[in-house]
Amino acid sequence: MGRKLLGLLMLAVLLAGCAGVPSSSAPQAIGTVERPAPSNLPKPTPGMDPEVLLREFLKATADPANRHLAARQFLTQSASNAWDDAGSALLIDHVVFVETRAAERVSATMRADILGSLSDMGVFETAEGVLPDPGPIELVKTSGGWRIDRLPNGVFLDWQQFQATYKRNTLYFADPTGKTVVPDPRYVAVPDHDQLATELVSKLIAGPRPEMAHTVRNLLAPPLRLRGPVTRADGGKSGIGRGYGGARIDLEKLSTTDPHSRQLVAAQIIWTLARADIRGPYVINADGAPLDDRFRDGWTTSDVAATDPGVADGAGAGLHALVNGSLVSLDGQHTVVVPGAFGRMGDQTGAALSRNGRQVASVVTLHRGAPDMAASLWIGDLGAEAVQSADGHSLSRPTWSLDDVVWVVVDGNNVLRAIQEPASGQPARLPVDSVAVATRFPGPITDLQLSRDSTRAAMVIGGQVILASVEQTQAGQYALTYPRRLGFGLGNSVVSLSWRTGDDIVVTRTDSSHPVSYVNLDGVNSDAPPHGVQMPVTTVVANPSTAYVAGPQGVLQYSPSADGQQGWSEVPGLTVPGAAPVLPG
C-alpha cells in the first residue's frame, strides 16, 4: 500500500509539472536529528473532535525530529508502528475531510491541493495539482480521546505550519573552477539557534541536492566529518555566532592539503554560516590543528571575499544598451556609441558583456520577422573588432559562462557553446546536449541565461521558466540535465529573464498587472511593483542591486530603496523606443 501510494503521489507531482524530489541517505537527513520540538506544535487533548485532531496532526508533521515524534502522539501504538514516514513530504493546503462517523470509530478521506514537496534533505520545490486520494484514514476512541488508528504511509504537511516551523537557509558548494560558491537552498526546522550551525555544517558534509551532484565540488565530502558540535569560538555552547562570540568548527579526516582547496573548505563553511546570520570570527580546525595557520584566531568573510556569491559581475563596466541596433555606453546622462565593431554594426537584437565586462557577444538579425530572417553571432573585445561565431535563422540573446565561453540557442532548439580554438584562434561551435529539456518541455527556447556560477541555466519555453543543471561530461562536453519548472504562478506569461543573484531570477511578462516578477530556485514567485511600467516589456537584465527592462518609453530601472519608495524610473539617456539594456552575463 505504502509504496503504491508514494508512486501515485510522485506521479501527481510530475504531472503537475514539478520534478519529484529524490530522497537521500544523508547521515543528517531531516527526521533523524535529535533536537527539542518547536514550541508551537499542537498536542492531542482528550476532548478533541476527530476532524480537529486530523488537522492538528497535519500541523504536527512539521516537526521531523525523532521520526516525527510530535505527530506520532496523535496515533495509536499500532498505527505508529506501521506508519512509514520516510522520504519526501507533500505540502498541502485547502484540506477538506469527508467523514463517516460511528460511536467509537470514524473513517475519513482527505482532499487537498498540492503546493510543493520537501525532501528528507530539506530541499523544497513548488508544485501544483490536486492530491490523489491517498486512501482512508481511520480514527478510534481511546481512553485519552480520539486517535488515528490507520493512515497512509508518507508525510502530508500542512502548508501554514510548514511556513511557521521551517526556515530557509542556503548551503554553498564550490563551482567546478574553484572561483566561486554555488547556492543550494534548504529548509530546516531547528528552533534552537545554537544548534543551527551544527545542522548546516552537517548538511554540507552530507552533500548537495541530487541535481547538483555533478555540477559542483564539495570540499567537505566524507570521510571528512565534524569532531563535535559547532561551538562558540572560545568553546562555549551558547550564543554561537552572536555578538563577538563567533563560531568554532572542528573537523577531522580532512584529506586535502593544498592551500587553495583549504580556502574553498573555509569558503563553503563561512558563506553558509554568514548567510544564516551566524557571525564570525570562524575558528576552523582540522585534525586538531588550524585549517590555515594564518587564520588560527579565526576567519572573516573578507578572508574569502574572492568567492563571494553576492558579488556583481563586471560591476565596473556599467550599464550598456542597444540603441537603434548599435551598442552604446552611458556617460552621465548621455549615451556614447562604443568604438569598434559593436558600435558600427546595425541590426543588433541581443547582446551581453562578458563576466569581467571586457568582451561582448552580440546577435545581428537581418529581415527580422520575415521568412528570410537571418541571424549571426559576433564575439570580440569591447572597443575592438569582432568575429562571426555562429549563424542561423534565429539566435537567442547570448550569455557568458564563468570561463568566458558564449552560449546561444540556434533556431529555437539547438544550444551551442561558441569558443575560440586554442591552436588556430578560429571560432568553433560545440553542441550542448539538451535532450532532457526537449523531452520534458518541448518547444522553442526563446531565452537562455546562465547563472553567475554557470552551474545552472534558466530558459523561457512556451512562456514558462525552466531551470536546468549544467553538467560537464567525462568527455568534456556539456549537457542540460534535471529540467524543472519554476514559478507556477507566472503561468505562460514570461517573455525574458535574467539572473539577479545566484538564487533569484527576474522576468518580464505579458501580464499588464504584473509586468515584472521574481522567481527563486525553489520556484516561489513574487511581483515587482507595476506602476511606471508601460506594456509591452521585453528584454530584462539585472544585478543584485538593480533590474533594467526595455519598454515602449525606453529603458527603465528598479532599485528597492531603504525608505520603501519602490518604483520604476527612466534611465537618463536611454529614453529611446526600442532601446534594450545590456549588462555582464
UniProtKB/Swiss-Prot annotation:
Residues 24-46, 560-585 are annotated as: Disordered. It holds the Pfam family Germane. The keyword Transcription regulation does not apply. PROSITE patterns: PROKAR_LIPOPROTEIN (PS51257). A lipid is attached at residue 18 (N-palmitoyl cysteine). Coiled coil: none annotated. InterPro entries: GerMN, Lipoprotein_LpqB, Lipoprotein_LpqB_C. It is a lipid-anchor. The keyword Membrane applies. GO terms for cellular component: plasma membrane. Residues 1-17 form the signal peptide. A lipid is attached at residue 18 (S-diacylglycerol cysteine). It is found in: Cell membrane. Keywords: Cell membrane, Lipoprotein, Membrane, Palmitate, Signal. Belongs to the LpqB lipoprotein family. This is Lipoprotein LpqB. The gene is lpqB.
